[in-house]
Amino acid sequence: MKSSASAPAKAILFGEHAVVYSKPAIAAAIDRRVTVTVSESSSTHVTIPSLGIRHSSERPSGGILDYIGRCLELYHDASPLDIRVEMEIPAGSGLGSSAALTVALIGALDRYHGRDHGPGETAARAHRVEVDVQGAASPLDTAISTYGGLVYLDSQRRVRQFEADLGDLVIAHLDYSGETARMVAGVAERFRRFPDIMGRIMDTVESITNTAYRELLRNNTEPLGELMNLNQGLLDSMGVSTRELSMMVYEARNAGAAGSKITGAGGGGSIIAHCPGCVDDVVTALNRNWKAMRAEFSVKGLI
């Protein structure tokens, strides 16, 4: 018996980290996917060719395998499985690889066991896995990997799908990743030491996100770049940027981008840039030292 499922990666446009503190965020599914295939086996094996992982144990653990192990504990019986993961995105890139993996694995397990859950239940169960593994996580990543398209997550944790023209966007990523759990914990520690200041920062991120949402609903992309720059300044204040991420952000702007910012947890990973009329120039500039691509978005979530 064999079953498969795939889920898209994501780019957070506005609101990362603030979303952990019940602030809204906007994210879009990108056309890079994680596909998981599970099949009967005499013992449990996990193979992830893109990461060079071949792992055999009843309880996979360590790094990205923690998400697989927790999914099996919660949503599978004790029978052994052969699990193969095909990833079109680098792990730890800030593009939601762990969420896409978790959603795809839950989808594959549901099909394997003949279960039929709706997207809301799937997203909630995937979010539980991320919380268990990371200690804290917003529901945004798992929501976008489940639903696809564009998602606005409001302050009440309600998912609102919407349509909008995002204009020309570029994503670039580093060769090293930031550890999401460590970055989230770092922001939490700064919040503990400076609660009033950090509270105001999160409130301002909320205002930026809601302004972007209103403009996107009007299909007005003109202010997106400036709003990204404002959001980036606040991410820097949270302590999640690095020297090289900042270099990427400014290289994109110097090449003509209207705005650019970290996308994801930071500490490594990726940036996103709004590049009206200058996508090729920005991609060329960023590719001199990093890896960049035009952002192609996916309307499809879990399939």
UniProtKB/Swiss-Prot annotation:
A single GO molecular function term of this UniProt record: magnesium ion binding
PROSITE patterns: GHMP_KINASES_ATP (PS00627)
Obligatory cofactor(s): Mg(2+)
Signal peptide region: none
Catalyzed chemical reaction(s): (R)-mevalonate + ATP = (R)-5-phosphomevalonate + ADP + H(+)
Binding positions for ATP per the UniProt entry: 90-100
Cellular compartments annotated: Cytoplasm
InterPro entries in the cross-refs: GHMP_kinase_C_dom (IPR013750), GHMP_kinase_C_sf (IPR036554), GHMP_kinase_N_dom (IPR006204), GHMP_knse_ATP-bd_CS (IPR006203), Mev_gal_kin (IPR006205), Mevalonate_kinase_arc (IPR022937), Ribosomal_Su5_D2-typ_SF (IPR020568), Ribsml_uS5_D2-typ_fold_subgr (IPR014721)
Active site per the UniProt annotation: 141
Gene Ontology biological-process annotations: isopentenyl diphosphate biosynthetic process, mevalonate pathway
Pfam hit, one: GHMP_kinases_N
Entry annotated with the keyword Iron: no
Top-level taxon of the source organism: Archaea
Record's keyword terms, sorted: ATP-binding, Cytoplasm, Isoprene biosynthesis, Kinase, Lipid biosynthesis, Lipid metabolism, Magnesium, Nucleotide-binding, Transferase
GO terms for cellular component: cytosol
EC number: 2.7.1.36
Pathway membership: Isoprenoid biosynthesis; isopentenyl diphosphate biosynthesis via mevalonate pathway; isopentenyl diphosphate from (R)-mevalonate: step 1/3
Self-association state and partner proteins as the record states: Homodimer.
Family the UniProt entry places it in: Belongs to the GHMP kinase family. Mevalonate kinase subfamily.
Function as written in the Swiss-Prot or TrEMBL entry: Catalyzes the phosphorylation of (R)-mevalonate (MVA) to (R)-mevalonate 5-phosphate (MVAP). Functions in the mevalonate (MVA) pathway leading to isopentenyl diphosphate (IPP), a key precursor for the biosynthesis of isoprenoid compounds such as archaeal membrane lipids.
Protein name in UniProt: Mevalonate kinase
Organism (species): Methanothermobacter thermautotrophicus (strain ATCC 29096 / DSM 1053 / JCM 10044 / NBRC 100330 / Delta H) (Methanobacterium thermoautotrophicum)
Taxon lineage: Archaea, Methanobacteriati, Methanobacteriota, Methanomada group, Methanobacteria
Gene that this sequence comes from: mvk
